[in-house]
Amino acid sequence: FIWKKHRFSIFLPGQHQISNAVTALAAAEELMERLPSEGRRKLEPGENARFIPAADKRLGWPEMERGLANARWPGRLELLGERPYTFRDGAHNPDGARKLAQFLEKHFTNRRIIYIMGVLKDKEYEKMLAELMPLASEIYTFRPHNERGLSGEVLAACAQRFGVPSHCCQDVNEAIRRGREKAEQEDVIVICGSLSFMEEMED
């Protein structure tokens, strides 16, 4: 994308990441304008720029371009594998679920979407399901290992009200295994609902 006549590349999937990137660029530009043109200070004899704190280095358009190009965000539309495509996304509110659904609808039209989902009981999970279930072929639910985790049975029952075949599992790894067993190579598996269970996932 182009912002203020500068071309930027980002590798974070999802149209909303462009808006996030523009916000970050605006903040960086404000910081850049506050710094002297030569940077915070010049190098002393014998100093190596690699060991100077980031705030003491010059910030400019090349640094901003490299920063965005190198940005990665684990757990946000993170591609874990292909054939079938497998994504991990920490969307845990209706807005995040809506952005996830928009991404899937744009890039995976006419493909079967299999959700692996666990949520916390204090989240608006019914509204999240309302965003996600119109695209769903199946859903495998589980309770995250968290005292606030919602029962997988409750989540499955809610999903069934949208007419989606729902299966309750013991944990995220069982849900992933069963989802993969059911998926064809052209399907899409989406692991979502919370960031809290990411560390529970086996490699």
Language-model region placement:
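Short aromatic-centered micro-motifs
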Residues: 1
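C-terminal helical cap/extension that packs against the catalytic core
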Residues: 39, 85-87, 94, 129-188
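Active-site-proximal loop/hinge segments that shape catalytic or ion-binding/gating pockets
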Residues: 194
